[in-house]
Amino acid sequence: MAVASRQLKPAMMMLLCVSTTAWGDPGDDSLPPPPQAQAVNDEAVFQLALVLNHYDTGLVVPVTQRNGAFFISSADLLRAGLPPEHVPAGEVNLASLSQVRVEYDSAAQRLLLTLPRDWITARVTPFSAQTAQSKPHYGRGALLNYDLYTNHTEHIGGQASLWHELRYFDENGSFSSTGYARKNFTGNDGQQEGYVRYDTTLLITNEDDATTWSAGDVISDALSWTSSVRMGGISYGRDFSLRPDLVTWPLPEFSGEAAVPTSVDLFINGYRSGSTQLQPGPFTLTNLPYINGAGDAVLVTTDALGRQVSTTLPFYVTSDLLKTGLSDGAVTLGSLRRNYGIRNFDYGPAAGSGSYRYGVTDWLTLEGHAEGAEELALGGAGTVIKLGRFGVVNTAYSQSRMRGDNGGQISWGYQYSTSEFSVATQHTRRDRGFGNLALYDQPTVYDENDRPVASFSRNTDQYSLTFNLGQYGNIGAAWIGVESFDSQKTELLNLSWSRNLWGASSIYLAGSRDQQRGDWTVALSLQVPLGERDSAAVTFENTPDAGSSQRLNYNHSMPSDGGFSWNMAWANQSKSSDYQQGTLGWRNNNIELQGGGYGERDMMTWWGEAMGAIVLMDGELFAANKINDAFVVISTDGHPDVPVSYENQPVGKTNNNGYLLVSGVSAYYPASYRIDTLNLPADTRLKETERRIAIRRHSGYLVDFPMEQERVASVILHDVHGQALPVGSQVRRVSRKNAVVGYDGIAWLENLSDVNPLEVISPDGKRCKATLTVGANPEHKLQTYGPLVCREGL
C-alpha cells in the first residue's frame, strides 16, 4: 500500500495542474477579487436620531455616509425644521451647507447638527395639556318632565297648575314641547285657566363644528348692542357651548430662547400656575391656564446647572374677543311670536335676523348685525378692540328704517379688570325713529305729536367700579341712568360692601339711592354656617315703602343623594304685621316634594309642589328627578342594590332590575360614573367599575357595566399524610390559568366546571393530582371545598 501511494502522487500532481489550468481559461466563470477596505467604507447607510442645536427632533431618518461626508434627504431636513431657502432639493450633502456643523454620535446613534440661530423658528410648546374633545354619547328614548304646583291664600282663593316638558331624543337630535295647564279654585277668577303652550322645538347639533339647527319656536341670536326676539321658524348658527374644550378668546403667548434644556415655571399674579420643559432654541409658550383681565406673568427658567432667570411679562385677557380667524354668528328666519305665555299659536309678520362676529387679530374683533321685515330694514356694525394691557373698548352703530321713520343707534363702552379692581362703562344713544324687530310687531299707539309711544329709551348710561381690599373685603359701586324721549329720567346709585368673617361666615352691606325720589334702600346681612348643611342669617332692611324690618332665617340644605331639607324665617316689619315662612322638602331618586306656608297674620299662603320626570329608555320606565339637560341610566346587568357614584358623590342604588337613573348631568362634560362592587356576589366578574363619558345636550345614554357569573371556589389541598401542600405550589388545569397555593394549603380557583382535574407541582418539583367536584351554588355564595388529598403517581 505504501508503494501504491508513492506511485499515485505524480499522477495526482499532474491532474491538479491540468485542472487548475482549465479553470483559468478565458471565457469561463471566475470568482471576484476580494474587496478592498476602502471600498467597504466608502458608503454606509445608518438610521440616526436627528438633533438640531441640542434639540431632539424625535425623528429617526436614513443617513448615508459616503467618502467621509453625510447625506440626508431634503424632505427629512424640512421635517426637522430647517428653513426651505437653505435646503437644496433632493439628497443633500451636509458638508455643502457651510453654516452647518455636523457631528456623528456613534455610541448614541445620533446625528448632531449645529445651525445658525436665525435658521430655527420658534417651537410652539403647550404649557398645559389641551383639553381633549370628548365625543358625546347619546341614546334613544323619551321623557316627561312635570311640575305640579298648588296654593291657597286666605280670603282670596287658590289655584293649581301643571307644567310639563315632553322630550324625544335619538341619534339625530331632540324634539321638545313645553306648556302648562291651570285650574283656578273658588275666589280666584282673575287668572287665566286652561292650557298654554310655551315652545315646541326640534334641535339638531353638530359638535364637530359647534353648530346647531333649530326649527319651531326659536329665539334669534343677539349681540351686546342688539335685541333678541321670539320667532316661529328656523335658526342656524354657532354654539360654542357644544365644545367646552375650545377656548374662543385669545390667550397670551410668551416667547423666548433657551440655550440648553430648561424647565420653566409660570406664576400668574403671584400664584404658581404650573411648569413645563423646554428644549434648546426659540420657543413660544401657548395654551396657558385660563385667565382674565390684567395681570403679570412671571416666567422662571432653570437650566441643568440650577441657574435661574426671572422674566416679568404683563398681559390683558378678555373673553369679549375672538381668536384670530375664529367666527361666530347665527341666522334666524320665521314669523314673530305674539302673546307668548298667553296664547298657544299666535304668530305675526315674517321677519329675519342675523349676527356675525369675526376675530381679525388677537386685539380686534369685528361684529355685524342685520334685521329685516316687510317694513323694516336694519343694519349695524361694531368692533371690540383691546388697548394693549389697558383694557377693552367696544363700539357699535346701527341704522334702521321702520314704517317710513329713519333712526340710528350708537353705543360704546370701556372695560378694565385686574385682581385688585375693575371699572366698566357702557353708553347708548338713540334717535326717536330707531326701530328693530323688538318694536316692529308692537301695537302702534301715537302721541299728540304723531310719534309712536312704543320706543326705546333715548339715552342709557352705566358705570361700575369694584375694589378688592384683601382682608377688608370687597366694595362696589354702580350708577345707572335712563332717559326716555319724553325726558323722564331714572337714575339709581348702588353701593355694596362684603367681607368674610370667621370660618365661612360673611357680612354684606348694600345701599341703593333713587335720585328722582331722593330716598335710600339699605340692607345689612350676616351669614353664619352651622355645620355641613345648616346655616343661619340675620338681615336688617329699610325701604321707603315697606319701612324697616328685621329678619331671621335658618336653612338646612338637602344631601346630594336625597333626603330632607327645610327653611324657617321670621321678620318683624314696622309698617305691617310680622312675616313668617316655613318650607319642608324631601327628595329621593324618583320625585321631589316641597310644601310650606308664607305670609302675614290672617293672610297666609299655603302651597305644595311635586317635581320629577318619567323616562322611557332601554325598554324600562323610570320615575326620576326633574331632568333639565342630560341624564344617564346606569345598568348593572340585573344586579339590584348596587351603589352608584356620580363625580365621586353617591346618587343612589340600582333598582330591582339593576337600573339607576342619574338626572343631574351636565351635557358635554366627561363625568365619572362608578359602581361599588363590595356587595356583589363573590362569583361576579366585571370588566370595569368606572366609566368617564360625556352626554349630548337634551339626550340620555345607557351606561352599562357588563357582569357575568363565574363559578369560583376555594379549595384546601393536603398530601397523603394530611399535611397542607407547600406555599407557592402551582395548581394546573387544562385550558385554565395556573393558581398558587397559599397558607394552609388554600388555593383560589376560577372558571370552574362540574368536575375539575387538578395537577399540583410543589416548589421542589414533586407532582400530585386531585379532583375537585363542584356542586350547585344558586345563592352565589363563596364556597370552600376540601381538604382534598393530592396523590402522587396517579
Question: Regions from the language model: what does each represent?
Answer:
Residues 649-658, 735-746:
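Short, acidic Ser/Thr/Gly-rich low-complexity loop/linker segments typical of extracellular
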Residues 134-136, 160-172, 193-207, 348-362, ...:
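Feature captures outer-membrane beta-barrel proteins of Gram-negative bacteria and organelles
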Residues 41-48, 56-61, 638-648, 721-734:
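Short, ordered, surface-exposed loop/turn motifs in non-cytosolic proteins
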Residues 50, 256, 632-636, 711-720:
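A short, amphipathic beta-strand motif
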Residues 148-154, 181-185, 217-221, 262, ...:
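Transmembrane beta-strands of outer-membrane beta-barrel pores
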Residues 110-114, 317-323, 689-709, 773-794:
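Extracellular beta-sheet/turn segments enriched in Thr/Pro/Gly and aliphatic residues
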Residues 64-72, 288-294, 659-685, 743-758, ...:
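Short Pro-Gly-centered beta-turn/loop motif in secreted/extracellular proteins
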Residues 2-16, 24-248, 544-615, 623:
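Post-signal-peptide, soluble extracytosolic/periplasmic N-terminal scaffold domains
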